[in-house]
UniProtKB/Swiss-Prot annotation:
NCBIfam families: EF-G, PRK12740.1-5, small_GTP
InterPro entries: EF-G-like_DII, EFG_II, EFG_III, EFG_III/V, EFG_IV, EFG_V, EFG_V-like, G_TR_CS
Species this protein is from: Mesorhizobium japonicum (strain LMG 29417 / CECT 9101 / MAFF 303099) (Mesorhizobium loti (strain MAFF 303099))
Gene Ontology CC terms, in alphabetical order: cytoplasm
Compartments reported by the entry: Cytoplasm
Highest taxon listed in the record's lineage: Bacteria
UniProt cross-references to CDD domains, sorted A to Z: EF-G, EFG_III, EFG_mtEFG1_IV, EFG_mtEFG_C, EFG_mtEFG_II
Protein name: Elongation factor G
Gene name for this UniProt entry: fusA
Listed SMART domains: EFG_C, EFG_IV
């Protein structure tokens, strides 16, 4: 079976947004107009096709990024193949967003026209910047009370520091929103309400918008001609580019991430979705337009590139693992080069294992089709892989490559969890193991002293959902303890410690002497170890033992048993014995050396500080600020946003538990907040003593 669509006709993109900016609704409309789903699913009644896990339907937020394949005929009448990756917008799931951004070629950033650029929009935007993802902006919810397109344009500059190139102007706003002005063609599109937005009329631009349309068209052309010297010279001489030239220049600038074309509409009211789909074809890159993916040769560690062509060796990245009730475990993978055929064996170069490709599926949001082969640029779901987890590379065994690993943040919150019955015990272990394989930002460990199972994640909602999924998908009932903060310890003073480890018990003894300088690592939170041994006072082969010994103590710090960060250790001297020294002896010596040095290093407890943003009606500002101050918060500032006030604060995580309930009762349910981890900071002495009493 040959390739059906040329790679130039592929668009792999995601829709990224803040909670409630209308992401699922927009995706639904896209699926509806591209003919994949017959009944439009509304999030309001819990029936959207993309949100296929039960909880998502209840909470109305999207949790797992499902990949969907669909087709769209562009303005030129040619069919294009869209692979849409649904990304979550809730801050507890930013890991999912990062993961989907890795495998996208482009994205549509949704804004709520009423709120403009919201806190989570900034987070997701920064992540997309990190991976240099070309984006278009869709200003959604133009029918909402308080919708303001022009303020949203301004906020993209002021809050994101990005250049939006306005491609459409809204006709009317709020309940009067009727359609859009197309600034390339200079005409107006007005939707017919009675056809569910499937039909629209092309009319002249309303008189009251003509001057504004002219002004924004000029801005658009100025941005476009910057992308090409000849076009710029012609423009300066008064020669206007043709509409097709404008489109190709805007495409060039979008793919180069120089600016972001901006559109508007209301997905809920079915207005503006089709021009947005045309724009995906016109402006977002195909897999052939983005730089080749870089990796390292698994044998030689040399950097190599893989291009999006079918005759290069196969390489693909597993970016999501899901449990499907019918097929079992599904691994979603993006093929970067080569082609994949059912039944072949591939190498997992990260794990050093082989995998056999059994069933290959192309996914719609909740239905699936078996395929025999897939090509560069495709996104496929593979059933029954044994050892592959998120972020692994699968490739041709003859040309092993490791595509770059993704970085996953450390969890900031943990809770103890125990099964309700003996029967649940075994099932719980299996369930947690499966969920951890799906989600690298979720960790499971057993507390050695208490024997409790501890789960940790990115926030309260994250862990709530994990416990909820255990109950639904694995039928495991569990009791959950109070959340605990992931404290850290660090040192504040420097000290040189000399320690000799001697043990003589007949036969071979143990001997090692180390002299280590411990000091705070002021540059980062990492542990840095270096050896300044000269003249072989400690032989090279024993030095890793010294590092390992120090690291083993850092796993449980001396203050209250929390992991240590920000330590720099330098091995400056030592001694060994020809017979009695070993790596183990040096490991034991350096461990004891660090323990002896600890009381002199000024060990200090650190706590995670969260960046909190509360959006509240004016009436409650006083109570919200008072409450945040009472939580040891530091108010960073406040600003008006429409009729609401935005309060920014840095607050210790320890004081943010159950905040959502308090905020609700304080503001009669009208205020909302988001928080994300920002940095670690020393804990005040009185609080530190309480923590020490509780944990040490």
């Amino acid at each position: 079976m040959a390739r059906e669509y040329k790679i130039e006709d592929y668009r792999n993109f995601g829709i990224m947004a803040h909670i409630d900016a209308g992401k699922t609704t927009t995706t639904e409309r896209v699926l509806y107009y591209t003919g994949k789903s017959h009944k439009i699913g509304e999030v309001h009644d819990g029936a959207a096709t993309m949100d296929w896990m039960e909880q998502e339907q209840e909470r109305g937020i999207t949790i797992t990024s499902a990949a969907t394949t669909t087709f769209w005929k562009g303005r030129d009448g040619k069919m294009r193949r869209f692979n849409i990756i649904d990304t979550p917008g809730h801050v507890d799931f930013t890991i999912e967003v990062e993961r989907s951004l890795r495998v996208l070629d482009g994205a549509i950033a949704l804004l709520d026209a009423n709120a403009g650029v919201e806190p989570q929009t900034e987070t997701v935007w920064r992540q997309a910047d990190k991976y240099r993802v070309p984006r278009m902006i869709f200003c959604n919810k133009m029918d909402k009370i308080g919708a303001d397109f022009y303020r949203s344009v301004e906020m993209i500059g002021s809050r994101l520091g990005a250049q939006a190139v306005v491609m459409q102007l809204p006709i009317g706003a709020e309940t009067e929103f009727k359609g859009v002005v197309d600034l390339v063609e200079m005409n107006a599109l007005v939707w017919r309400d009675e056809t569910l937005g499937a039909a629209w009329d092309v009319v002249e631009i309303p008189a009251d918008l003509q001057a504004r349309a002219q002004e924004y068209r000029e801005k658009m052309i100025e941005a476009a001609v910057e992308m090409d010297e000849t076009a710029l010279e012609n423009y300066l001489e008064g020669k206007m580019p043709s509409n097709d030239e404008i489109r190709s220049l805007i495409r060039k600038g979008t793919i180069a991430v120089k600016f972001f074309p901006m559109f508007c509409g209301s997905a809920f009211k079915n207005k503006g979705v089709q021009p947005l789909l045309d724009a995906v074809v016109e402006y977002l890159p195909s897999p052939a337009d983005v730089p080749a993916i870089k990796g390292v040769d698994a044998k030689t560690d040399a950097e190599i590139e893989r291009h999006a062509v079918d005759d290069e060796p196969l390489s693909m990245l597993a970016f999501k693992i899901m449990n499907d009730p019918f097929v079992g475990s599904l691994t979603f993978a993006r093929i970067y080069s080569g082609k994949l055929t059912k039944g072949i064996s591939v190498d997992n170069t990260v794990k050093g294992k082989k995998e056999r490709i059994g069933r290959m599926l192309q996914m719609h949001a909740n239905s699936r089709a078996d395929v025999e082969e897939a090509f560069a640029g495709d996104i496929v779901a593979l059933a029954g892989l044994k050892d592959t987890t998120t972020g692994d590379t699968l490739c041709d065994p003859l040309h092993p490559v490791i595509l770059e690993r993704m970085e996953f943040p450390d969890p900031v919150i943990q809770i103890a969890i125990e099964p309700k019955t003996k029967n649940d015990q075994e099932k719980m272990g299996l369930a947690l193991h499966r969920l951890a394989a799906e989600d690298p930002s979720f960790r499971v460990k057993t507390d050695e002293e208490s024997g409790q199972t501890i789960i940790s994640g990115m926030g309260e909602l994250h862990l709530d959902i994990i416990v909820d999924r255990m109950r639904r998908e694995f039928k495991v009932e569990a009791n959950v303890g109070a959340p605990q903060v992931a404290y850290r310890e660090t040192i504040t003073r420097k000290h040189e410690q000399d320690y000799t480890h001697k043990k003589q018990t007949g036969g071979t003894g143990q001997f090692a002497r180390v002299k280590v300088l411990f000091e705070p690592n002021t540059e980062s939170e990492e542990f840095v170890f270096e050896s300044k041994i000269v003249g072989g006072a400690v032989p090279k082969e024993y030095i890793p033992g010294v590092e390992k010994g120090i690291q083993s103590v850092m796993g449980a710090g001396p203050f209250a048993g929390f992991p240590m960060i920000g330590v720099r250790a330098t091995l400056i001297d030592g001694a060994y014995h020809d017979v009695d020294s070993s790596v183990l002896a040096f490991e034991i010596a350096s461990r004891a050396c660090f323990r002896e040095a600890a009381p002199k290093l000024g060990v200090q407890l650190l706590e995670p500080i969260m960046k909190v943003e509360v959006v509240t009606p004016e009436d409650y500002v006083g109570s919200v600020i008072g409450d945040l101050n009472g939580r040891r918060g530091q108010i960073q500032g406040q600003e008006a946003r429409g009729v609401a006030v935005v309060i920014n604060a840095m607050v210790p995580l320890a004081n943010m538990f159950k905040y959502v309930d308090n905020l609700r009762s304080m503001s009669q349910g009208r205020a909302a907040y988001t928080m994300q981890f920002d940095h670690y900071e020393p804990v005040p002495t009185a609080v530190a003593q309480e923590v020490q009493k509780k944990y040490a």
